């Protein structure tokens, strides 16, 4: 990916893919840097925000992860997985009320995973 970036430094997807590789190698700081560059080049792609949120979650930067998931939802408000993932982060933050709102929205949009989490976390 380094060579591809050298040849075409304005291609956001290359940064995203390198970020995914770094994420898989547990280099979350490096991944966040690459996702941030991808977002700077193309702030309209919700996947870049989702991916950065995953790395932020791994680093326990829960507030940052929620912010990125929220940005993704603004761009693509019908993706149940993003609501589900944001809810899981909110559970980690011990914010079950808001998590339950997201789980319910995820379920409404078709997430089967959310249904089990609603039973577990939402009373």
Positions of predicted regions on the chain:
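Alpha-helical tetratricopeptide repeat
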Residues: 1-123
């Amino acid at each position: 990916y380094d060579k591809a970036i050298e040849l075409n430094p304005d291609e956001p997807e290359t940064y995203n893919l390198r970020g995914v590789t770094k994420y898989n190698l547990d280099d979350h700081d490096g991944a966040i840097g690459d996702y941030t560059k991808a977002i700077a080049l193309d702030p309209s792609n919700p996947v870049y925000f989702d991916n950065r949120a995953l790395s932020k979650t791994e680093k326990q930067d829960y507030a940052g992860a929620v912010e990125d998931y929220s940005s993704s939802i603004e761009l693509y408000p019908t993706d149940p997985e993003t609501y589900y993932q944001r809810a899981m982060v909110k559970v980690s933050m011990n914010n079950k009320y808001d998590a339950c709102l997201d789980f319910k929205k995820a379920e409404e949009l078709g997430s089967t995973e959310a249904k089990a989490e609603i039973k577990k976390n939402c009373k």
